[in-house]
């Protein structure tokens, strides 16, 4: 009513603009009351509320042993000196084996008892950079591999933002190598700190994001696939451009994919590969000797092919006899070298999946052994299954499989899952996240044991409770549980009678305690929830719960629609609204004439009218103002007109007297 009086006063004051402003103010959405809004994600809200909180200022000594404190989004981390490590630099590192350590980026070296093998990634990176400068694509030599593999008895504890066995990889390095090139090339940080991609064939762009039309097109016999753009139709098609001539022997290459090769009958037989009575050494020797010396680049490239022999023992050797090793198939083909000239040589098609190399000369012991490419890349055989601590590679019918160690799963044993081996036996296993702090040497899981089992303090597994006091059939149609419980149990299972006999029977539905042998109504002491109705199932000697609308589950324990389940019956004089923030899951919006939590309190007519006016204030307030105005103005107008009539009547009387003196 105070608002109405204010509007009336303003109306008579002639300030209609102020009335409009008040109505606009009332129409605005009420601001959210953050303090009263229930928090269902306290962790995310805490980060939002406390992201400017600086724990380093609140506790300047939070990092011990001269560690430097840095904060980020309300959290902190410590940059420790090389002599300490840990969340707050609380651990002292044993420096016994760290005199010549290779730990990078201010990481902490910690001595360990056993030797471990690591890859000197710093040296490997230097070798690759040098080879890129020299334009060499040859595999790593045995000397280089021996230099890269290191056996050390220390570990590197990395500072925040660094990774790898030597803490030499930054977050930028990892992102560049694994993500930036979209899986279509190799990324590397250049001298200016920018990530550059070396794209695979048929991919191009700064991030190898564009795909050539030649991606699915294979050109044989030295053919080169080219993208042909039709600007009218705005389409790109792949076309194979075949060699126009074949050096030394002549011949032509034709076909849509350059698949047709015609060799003239006049071609010298010593220049024909895969011929009987000849071999690789004789062929390349005569072939290269007949190439003009003005094509020295071609000669060098063909010499490299001839010497591309590496069986793991004899590196950069040559084929001494035959064309291919290990039952490889000799396949003649035209090869285009860097100068774009085409030569008719051959390649070996390996028939054994365990062999590779240009001559199929590299043969692995089994599928778990390293391929030639993996050796050149610096991979290790014990990394086939992530590392030796996660699992081991086993050859099964010529296919490599990872046999994971306890607590690890996945195709390469890369997933840490302490519950995978079911360590709790008779209970449920709950894994402890890697982010949680646990004492060194303790399990990274927790066992939740059922009533029929208890936790073994030594193995931390759930073991069956001693059932010697539970004779066979003692509990009929139920489960026998011994009354051996700890003295500090807050809710002991057994009563005095149970303790005297040494056990308690937990009966199935439809059987009465204490020994679960007397059959009764299965709905006796049923577990149906949320007003569900218990129905007997005579076939199963059990019961089913018939759920009310809005609930579900075997015991009707889940509520999907609180209004359908309960609210519509309670909000008789109102409308039920599902409200997850309300403890009972719904709230009542009352009809006119009722109020209260359940809209069960009837209110006076005057209060109803006031509520209606306030609900429709945009229309009702101006109307009320008008009615009040009319109620006040009408008497004034009537009095004014009566007064005016009296004046006019008096005036007429005066005029009559003047005319008749």
From Swiss-Prot:
Q: Which residues lie on this side of the membrane: Cytoplasmic?
A: 640-661
SMART domains membership: EGF (SM00181), EGF_CA (SM00179)
Cellular component (GO) terms are: cell surface; cytoplasm; membrane-bounded organelle; plasma membrane; pseudopodium
Signal peptide position in this chain?
1-16
Residues in the Extracellular compartment per record: 17-618
Which Gene3D superfamilies does UniProt cross-reference here?
Laminin (2.10.25.10)
Q: List the disulfide bonds.
A: 56-69, 63-78, 80-89, 214-225, 219-240, 242-258, 385-402, 393-404, 413-419, 523-534, 528-545, 547-556, 563-576, 571-588, 590-599
**Expressed in which tissues:** Expressed in spermatids, during spermogenesis expression is primarily localized to the pseudopod.
Q: How does it sit in the membrane?
A: Single-pass type I membrane protein
Transmembrane domains' residue ranges? 619-639
Q: PROSITE patterns annotated for this entry?
A: EGF_1, EGF_2, EGF_3
The EGF-like domain sits at: 52-90, 210-259, 377-414, 519-557, 559-600
List the glycosylation sites: 105-106, 134, 190, 279, 290, 316, 338, 549
The record's principal subcellular location, in a coarse class, is: cytoplasm
SUPFAM superfamilies (alphabetical): EGF/Laminin
MF annotations from Gene Ontology: calcium ion binding; signaling receptor binding
InterPro entries (UniProt xref): EGF-like_Ca-bd_dom, EGF-like_dom, Notch_Cell-Fate_Det
Q: Where is this motif: Cell attachment site?
A: 377-379
Summary of the function given for this chain in its UniProt record:
Required for fertilization. May be required for cell adhesion and/or function as a signaling molecule.
| Entries under PANTHER family matching the protein | CRUMBS FAMILY MEMBER, DROSOPHILA CRUMBS HOMOLOG
Q: Any miscellaneous information on file?
A: Removing the EGF-like repeats in any combination completely abolishes fertilization. Modifying each EGF repeat by changing a central cysteine residue to a tyrosine disrupts the secondary structure as the specific disulfide bridges responsible for this overall structure are not formed. The cysteine to tyrosine mutation when located in EGF-like domains 1,3,4 and 5, causes a complete loss of function. The same mutation in additional EGF-like domains leads to a temperature sensitive sterile phenotype.
User: How is this protein named in the record?
Assistant: Sperm transmembrane protein 9
Q: What organism does the record attribute this protein to? A: Caenorhabditis elegans
In the UniProt record, the gene name given for this protein reads spe-9
């Amino acid at each position: 009513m105070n608002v109405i009086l204010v509007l009336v006063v303003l109306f008579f004051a002639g300030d209609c603009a102020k009335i409009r402003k008040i109505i606009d103010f009332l129409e605005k959405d009420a601001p959210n009351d953050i303090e009263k809004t229930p928090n269902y994600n306290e962790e995310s809200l805490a980060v939002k509320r406390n992201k400017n909180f600086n724990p380093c200022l609140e506790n300047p000594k939070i990092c011990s042993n001269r560690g430097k404190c840095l904060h980020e989004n309300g959290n902190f981390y410590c940059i420790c000196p090389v002599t300490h490590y840990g969340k707050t630099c609380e651990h002292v590192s044993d420096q016994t084996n760290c005199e010549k350590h290779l730990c990078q980026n201010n990481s902490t070296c910690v001595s360990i008892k056993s030797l471990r093998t690591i890859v000197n990634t710093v040296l490997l990176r230097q070798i690759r950079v040098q080879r890129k400068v020299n334009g060499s694509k040859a595999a790593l030599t045995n000397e280089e591999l021996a230099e890269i593999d290191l056996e050390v008895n220390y570990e590197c504890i990395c500072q925040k933002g660094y990774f790898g066995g030597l803490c030499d990889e930054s977050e930028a390095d990892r992102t560049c190598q694994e993500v930036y090139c979209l899986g279509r090339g190799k990324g590397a940080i250049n001298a200016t700190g920018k990530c550059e991609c070396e794209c695979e064939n048929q991919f191009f762009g700064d991030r190898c994001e564009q795909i050539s039309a030649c991606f699915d097109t294979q050109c044989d016999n030295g053919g080169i696939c080219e993208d042909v753009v039709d600007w009218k139709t705005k389409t790109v098609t792949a076309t194979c451009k075949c060699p126009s001539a074949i050096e030394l022997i002549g011949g032509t290459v034709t076909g849509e994919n350059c698949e047709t090769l015609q060799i003239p009958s006049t071609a010298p037989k010593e220049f024909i590969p895969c011929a009987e009575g000849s071999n690789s050494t004789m062929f390349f020797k005569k072939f290269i000797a007949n190439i003009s010396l003005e094509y020295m680049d071609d000669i060098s490239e063909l010499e490299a092919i001839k010497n591309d022999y590496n069986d793991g023992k004899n590196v950069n050797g040559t084929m001494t006899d035959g064309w291919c090793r290990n039952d490889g198939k000799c396949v003649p083909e035209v090869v285009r070298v860097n100068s774009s000239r085409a030569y008719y040589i051959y390649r070996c098609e390996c028939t054994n999946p365990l062999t590779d190399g240009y001559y199929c000369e590299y043969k692995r012991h089994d599928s778990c052994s390293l391929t030639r490419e993996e050796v050149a890349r610096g991979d290790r055989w014990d990394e086939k299954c992530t590392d030796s601590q996660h699992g081991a590679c086993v050859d099964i019918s010529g296919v490599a499989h990872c046999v994971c160690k306890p607590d690890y799963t996945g195709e390469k044993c890369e997933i840490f899952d302490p519950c995978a081996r079911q360590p709790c036996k008779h209970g449920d296993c709950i894994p402890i996240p890697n982010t949680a702090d646990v004492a060194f040497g303790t399990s990274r899981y927790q066992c939740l044991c059922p009533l029929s089992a208890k936790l073994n303090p030594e193995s931390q597994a759930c073991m069956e409770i001693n059932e010697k006091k539970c004779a066979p059939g003692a509990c009929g149609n139920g489960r026998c549980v011994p009354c051996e419980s700890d003295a500090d149990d807050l809710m002991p299972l057994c009563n005095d009678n149970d303790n005297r006999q040494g056990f308690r029977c937990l009966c199935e539905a439809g059987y009465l305690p204490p020994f679960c042998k007397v059959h009764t109504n299965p709905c006796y002491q049923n577990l149906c929830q949320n007003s569900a109705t218990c129905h007997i199932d005579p076939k199963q000697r059990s019961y089913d719960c018939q759920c009310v609308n809005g609930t579900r589950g075997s015991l009707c324990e889940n509520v999907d629609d609180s209004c359908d389940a309960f609210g519509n019956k309670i909000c008789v004089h109102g409308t039920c609204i599902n409200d997850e923030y309300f403890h009972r899951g719904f709230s009542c919006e009352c009809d006119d004439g009722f109020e209260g939590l359940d809209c069960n309190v009837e209110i006076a007519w005057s209060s109803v009218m006031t509520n209606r006016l306030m609900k429709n204030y945009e229309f009702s307030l101006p109307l009320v103002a008008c009615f009040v105005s009319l109620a006040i103005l009408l008497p004034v107008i009537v009095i004014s007109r009566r007064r005016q009539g009296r004046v006019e009547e008096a005036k007429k009387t005066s005029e009559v007297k003047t005319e008749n003196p």
